[in-house]
């Protein structure tokens, strides 16, 4: 395995501090991994420009790579194109559902810009019912909303698409 492949593999173990069931790879925020003069360069895009977890993510990336013998890690942030939930891996979406968080639906399915946008039903991650109600636009983090399933009665987070 070459060094860049090794780095990608190491990044699989770096958890998102706000949704620890996901790695930074699952989340889809790692855009590029390269070596410049033998030193790792990681290019990432935050889930949104004011994401409070970015400093902790950078620290976790550096620590993980340092533990595997990589030093002088450069981490570059790229804001364009902006991250979308479509960049999240299918494995990551499955992990969210297993953890009890409804994964984001594809952008074209649920996120309609404009004045007359219609809210789509979000399936319950526990019983798969679409008979759900949004309780709050904002959950424990800015990227989640709180829903309740009207069939099983359970509240759940929905990872909002953007």
Predicted segments — roles?
Residues 1-162:
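Domain-level signature for proteins that mediate thiol-based redox and metal-cofactor handling
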